[in-house]
């Protein structure tokens, strides 16, 4: 069975971000991040979720991933918020049975 999906690829235009903080904010919202807090000689590790933790996907490359067609609206909406700072494209693809995990 063939499954419809979207390949999404993006490139960050670093000069358009006001600061490194804002650029990191983009990546954290998309991928999530690991937070480590050291307090009273104890180490607390938290995994903060990003958008891709909530959407099934296959990571193709550092800035490319495939999402099911019915889930792509969330991703497109996210990238539209960053359009002036991030160049992105989406392409319709068909996945064969081998990629049913998406």
Task: Give the location of each predicted region.
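Glycine-rich loops and low-complexity Gly/Arg-rich segments
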Residues: 31-36, 89-93
